[in-house]
Amino acid sequence: MTDLFSSPDHTLDALGLRCPEPVMMVRKTVRNMQPGETLLIIADDPATTRDIPGFCTFMEHELVAKETDELPYRYLIRKSG
């Protein structure tokens, strides 16, 4: 089985940051990415379990994978085109 998190195009370390900082950083990072590129987000704020999927839905990016069963949380998103 392939680890979807193993080779992202970009990585964002949001450990220790609290709402709304992680999503603000995700938005800024995604803005500078090319369509189709992926971003791995590593976070420990419980609010990201709601905020990151919500951001993807609102901005129409793909939430490729998420791991939120234990810390740190990991999310992989693909920028829409």
Swiss-Prot record:
GO terms for molecular function: sulfur carrier activity. One of its GO terms (biological process) is tRNA wobble position uridine thiolation. It holds the Pfam family TusA. Pathway: tRNA modification. The keyword Cytoplasm applies. InterPro entries: Sulphur_carrier_TusA, TusA-like, TusA-like_sf. It is found in: Cytoplasm. The keyword DNA-binding does not apply. One of its GO terms (cellular component) is cytoplasm. Keywords: Cytoplasm, tRNA processing. The active site is at 19 (cysteine persulfide intermediate). Belongs to the sulfur carrier protein TusA family. Sulfur carrier protein involved in sulfur trafficking in the cell. Part of a sulfur-relay system required for 2-thiolation during synthesis of 2-thiouridine of the modified wobble base 5-methylaminomethyl-2-thiouridine (mnm(5)s(2)U) in tRNA. Interacts with IscS and stimulates its cysteine desulfurase activity. Accepts an activated sulfur from IscS, which is then transferred to TusD, and thus determines the direction of sulfur flow from IscS to 2-thiouridine formation. Also appears to be involved in sulfur transfer for the biosynthesis of molybdopterin. Interacts with IscS. HAMAP family: Thiourid_synth_A. This is Sulfur carrier protein TusA.
